[in-house]
């Protein structure tokens, strides 16, 4: 396999694996290890009621929880993923042999 292909693809795969892992851990994605929906539950839940902690205030929280995916999440992904891809492509061009 060409090193440049691995250099460009690896950040995308890395981001995908950790996104799926943490959203599964936080019970946002309710999928089996093979990526199939579990029986009897919705495969995706956008609202999550986070556990009480010192960081989360006890008053003024919505009863259904906070949305997991927001405009800010979309903006970070819309800017971050292409940036990583672009930097990987530039780095891959450094190893081009003529």
Swiss-Prot record:
Subcellular location: Membrane
Primary residence: membrane
Listed name of the protein: PsbF-like protein
Biological function: Unknown. Resembles PsbF, one of the subunits of the photosystem II reaction center. However, it encodes asparagine rather than histidine at the site PsbF uses to bind heme.
Coiled coil spans: none
Keywords: Membrane, Transmembrane, Transmembrane helix
Organism: Prochlorococcus marinus (strain MIT 9312)
Transmembrane segments: 5-25, 73-93
Top-level division of the source organism's lineage: Bacteria
